[in-house]
Amino acid sequence: MKKIIFLAVLLCVSFYGFSQDPKYGVRTGYNISNLDFDGTPINENKHRNGFMIGFFGEYSLSKSVAVAPELQFSAEGAKREAFKLDYIQLPVMFKFRISERFALAAGPQAGVKVHKTEDGIKNFAYSGVAGIEIKISHQFFADARYTYGFTNIFEDYIPAEAINTNIQLGLGFKF
């Protein structure tokens, strides 16, 4: 956990020197999450509704390209209690402005599971994230993202495979 926080701070500080107009902010939103099983699910597999909250730095690399490292809490997984997975995540989004109000974003994400640590589910998760951002005003924005897990959530000794998928609908404020 300390390593992820240190990495987030290091990313924010290191990009500060490259950026022409750094922005910082917070975002929060609603998650619709599910586990995508390879084959037949172990149990009934219903999606989980949850929330996310976090903060970010956004650093312009050019007029139309920016990088935005984030640190967020995200409630994901599935509805069944054993599959409720909460993560502290570090997405690094590369944003491509396509107009004054719209931007496309994509990037990698690493996550550390919080709460239960020895439950047969891996403590680290790696994902890809893609989405769109809509500028509401100079400071407010809305976004929609899709997260696709790259790694099996189960430990190697569990005879099942599943990845975490997530739709995020968010609102944010830039300082």
Regions found by a protein language model. Name each.
Residues Q20-P22, N45-F51, K84-I88, K122-Y126, ...:
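Residues that define the transmembrane beta-barrel architecture of outer-membrane proteins
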Residues P22, S64-V67, R101-L104, I134, ...:
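Repeated loop/turn-to-beta-strand initiation elements of outer-membrane beta-barrel proteins
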Residues V26-T28, P69, V92, A106, ...:
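Membrane-embedded beta-strand positions of outer-membrane beta-barrel proteins
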Residues I42-R80:
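Glycine- and aromatic-enriched membrane insertion/assembly motifs of diderm outer-membrane
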